[in-house]
Amino acid sequence: MLNRISVDPRVCVGKPTIRSLRITVDFVLKLLGDGYTADEIVQEYPELEKEDVYQAAKYGAWLASETTSGIV
């Protein structure tokens, strides 16, 4: 369950955020992609918890698993 991911059009232009903290899921995913560990992210951004980072990764995996179709 992704109960820490929020989508609100009034926060970060509707981008998915972590608990409406104005830290976007894509930002956390970029940090992970750059090699940061969950511990390092939480240390740099103390308002986050490790579970926030894990749920951001799960959300990214869920989006990547969605089937898309090309425009015909």
What kind of feature is each model-predicted range?
Residues 1-2, 66:
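A broad, low-specificity signal for short, low-complexity segments enriched in glycine/proline
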Residues 2-17:
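Short, Lys/Arg-enriched N-terminal segment that forms or immediately precedes the first helix
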Residues 12, 16, 33-36, 56-64:
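Small-side-chain structural scaffolding
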Residues 24-54:
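Amphipathic, hydrophobic secondary-structure cores in small proteins
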Residues 42-43, 47-72:
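C-terminal structural segments of small proteins and small subunits
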